[in-house]
Amino acid sequence: YKETRPRVAGPLCYEPWGPESMRVLKVCCTKAICQACDVQLEIRGHDLCPFCRCEPLSAADELAKLEHWAAKDSAAAVCQLGSCYRRGDLGLDIDAPRAVALYERAVELGDAKAVVHLGLMLAEGDGCPKDEARAAALFEALSKAKGPWAPWAENALGRLATNPHDAAKHWRRAADDGFS
């Protein structure tokens, strides 16, 4: 059997998935959906989760589910929980040191989005001591992985570079990989 069509990347649509930043995590089952599909489902009045058919959750229930999945070492849930602490979402107080700890755990579990968030917090000294060398090492490893976050990592490396020629090199690579 030979495939005549390209493999569908998204779980609900035929559009190829963009960078992971365009994915929406469904907390009820920790599955991701592309942002465009999530918006279309909302416009059409489909408020159930397209995967597990769960009813929409309140902020408290969503937080409880996130903590449940994070306790089971779901990398996406740990990263999302870190983002909630960083921004103060779901009724949480902003707690940057807790966000850093959660991002570090998500990085250990292999979440690329957490690498970007942790690297940015380290580079800015947000919730932790400023450590541009560690941030650059995180971004360098992510860039070499050539995943969907590689252009973001190259852009961040360009921002951290002290030499203008190195910065231009990283920004050129980011642009070549689709970062705009």
Question: PLM ranges: what are they?
Answer:
Residues 1-25:
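Proximal pre-RING flanking segment of RING-type E3 ubiquitin ligases
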Residues 30, 71-75, 87-89, 108-112, ...:
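Short helix-capping/linker turns of helical repeat alpha-solenoids
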Residues 78-87, 92, 115-124, 154-162:
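Hydrophobic face of amphipathic alpha-helices that form TPR/SEL1-like repeat modules
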